[in-house]
Amino acid sequence: MISCELPTAARSLMVSRNYLKREGKMSKTTARRQRRIYALLMVSCAIPSLAFAEISAADTEARRKSGTDDEVVVTAEKKVYQSVKAAEAVKYGNAVQVVTADDIRISGAANFAEMAQFLVKGVNVGYSPDEGEYTIRLDGGGDRDTLVIRDGVPLYDRGPALEDIWSSTTIDPHMIERVEVFRGGNSLFYGSNGGIGVVSLVSKKPDGTRKGEFGISYGSFQSREIWGNYAFPLDAEAKHSVMAYGSMQATDGPRIYNPKDFVDNVAAAGGVQEYPLNRNDIGLKYLWQIDKDTALRINAEYTESWFQDAFPDREIHSPNTVRYPIIDASFEKRWSPAIMTEVAAYFTNPKIWNTELYPDICKVPAGCLNPATNKTVPFGSYSGKVFPNGPFRGFGTSNQPRAGFKEMGMTVRNTVNIGEYLEFVAGLQSVKYQDDSAREFPVGNKANTTTGVFVDLRPKLPFSPDTAISVAVRTDFLDGSDNKTIWKLGFKQPVWGGVYVRGNGGTSYSLPRTTELNNETSTSVGNPNLIPEETKTYNGAIGYNGQFKDVAIALEVGGFKTEITDRIQGTTDFRIPAGNGFPARNTFFNNTALTRILGVTADVDVSVGRNWRLSLGYTAQDASLTSGLFKGEQINETPAWFINGTMSWMSDDQRLNLVLLPRMQGSEWSTGGLTVAGRPSIRKNFGNYTVVNATVNYFMGDERQHQIQLRIVNLFDEKYAERYGFGNQLYGSAFNRGEYTASSPKYFFGYPFEGKPRSFYVSLSTKF
């Protein structure tokens, strides 16, 4: 696992000699055991991240002038800023990776999912980045236990009625100053939903100086983008400054589904289509640098995205509009070298509007008249008409009400250093959210409030001053009389000659979403009896940091163990009987079987002078239920192993830069179809692929402030699937003619969400 002290991924090469081999004749237990043995043997030669921290007085003064208490880490001729939280996490045994704005810039990533897939180690992206719907999953976790936050604002979908909002899709990668990735349980400071990890985005901010950025891009699928930001002081002393920023992105999008996978009547009604995606945002940031140790920041932004999410088995037209306002503020005060206070608050109110049109099917044996052609349509075929999916997915004010939620929160965090032998962090966090959907939706707007208090004790051992120990506990007071107490332990011990040992562990929980508790639609019913998921995770590693002349290397090999109880899942067997005008529907339940995830990690970073950067991140994850029908089977959408990273070369004059970004992964499964004796009949492995992106960057100007970039996505044109879904023949002609029933294997089918084919993009950007 990578620490904050390591060099960043965009300046590195990921070279993999690791692979997992599964013999088809092996038992599942033997295969998993051999997979772990292969991983342990073969990753032992990996070399991960650089760590040579040094904070100078000049850096400290610059930090204070900018109104931040970020730490400065010097890694192989490059300074990397990181938050106090990240620096402390590394010190006390956590695995933390920092991805900088320069890393993102030379990668050319068009959205946050593309950035995370190739630059963030341990990440698997859920759903499809090209469809406008995706989530970030760390170390075998799911959407619920990897928390993405931006400047302290959680981008977690609380479950509005109608449709998921996919909050991470609103992120503009050009406005990211750095990404801090906390692997392992991190709910202590961040609250619910950080049970397996936290991906913290720190955005670009005003700092009292005059500066700006501007860029444009054009490429395959008529993709075009324009972005920029400009910051300037409001007074001569630069105590007050602002930054205005915004971007616009639009693309016709690549093909998502193979036309052969569409149900015949869906295709006949126009379901085979492009998948355009549009996103635009605008915002304003303000800094009041009260004095060198005190700063107040305020940000307001508004993002709108528009995308299609029609599927091959039903929708022929399904545009979504998301509008996402965010207001956040932070106050930082360093009272003395030993005491610091941080206060952060936010308010969000995302909303979504959704249209879903389905094909009308001729149910008359003698045939139907197509109103557009005045021709007779055969029995079971598309009639020429369409209808909205229920009363809330139409076009106008009468049949397209909004869905959404409101959320607000505040965190107060105090860091205190008491003398020579004790440091502690103490604070509180309060979060309140409620559904904000139109009254037509049967969800209710009851507010859910969680208030937590936490303390993190960091004793210093007089007999071992280099040993770092953290013992922390947090209690959350939920609505009613319920409360949750979680804990976290961490340590880091230097051994000798750059070798160290680290480890941490803790507990967390994840609350049910609003719609999982209360919603009622034509396909699903909420379950008010759901209880929170419980997560327990441990991870540890042994590492080495060293430098030999102009070659800097580091090694870390580790592992993790995660156990999830009462995991919240959706049914697939329509266990809610038909009634009240509804067909049979699905619901949600707590899976009583324990989910266990065992993982092996290895990270490598090598820096050779100012020319070469090589990086490697390897994660193997054996994730399965420990009992029941699916005992021992890899859980869905969790790769058995994967490797991601970069290889970067820079010319001697620091003008020409070549970058390769590979991602290689093993098996990844999806399960669905007809359920027989409690087991879905289709289990599809859609993994086992290698995708390589590449960029050519050329920097111009006296300060290399102008950049032209050629980006090639999927350099070798690999055919692969980002996701694998399942559909049925409800709108198929043969089914509607009665040739088979919904209990026939013919009724169900699977289909891949295709990965982006080889494509090209050119961008021009400048800093001023």
Report residues per predicted region:
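Extracytoplasmic beta-strand/coil segments of soluble accessory domains associated
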Residues: 81, 113-154
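Membrane-embedded beta-barrel scaffold of Gram-negative outer-membrane proteins
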Residues: 338, 342-356, 494, 501-502, ...
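A beta-strand signature from Gram-negative outer-membrane beta-barrel systems
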Residues: 170-213
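Gram-negative outer-membrane beta-barrel transporters
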Residues: 420, 424-425, 461-466, 561-563, ...
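Flexible loop and strand-edge segments within Gram-negative outer membrane beta-barrel domains
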Residues: 251-256, 273-279, 293-341, 345-390, ...
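Conserved C-terminal beta-signal and adjacent last beta-strands/turns
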Residues: 31-32, 36-43, 53, 231-235, ...
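Periplasmic-side early beta-strands and strand-to-turn transitions of outer-membrane beta-barrels
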Residues: 200, 208-209, 215-217, 229-321
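Short acidic/polar hinge/loop motifs at secondary-structure boundaries
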Residues: 125, 154-183, 228
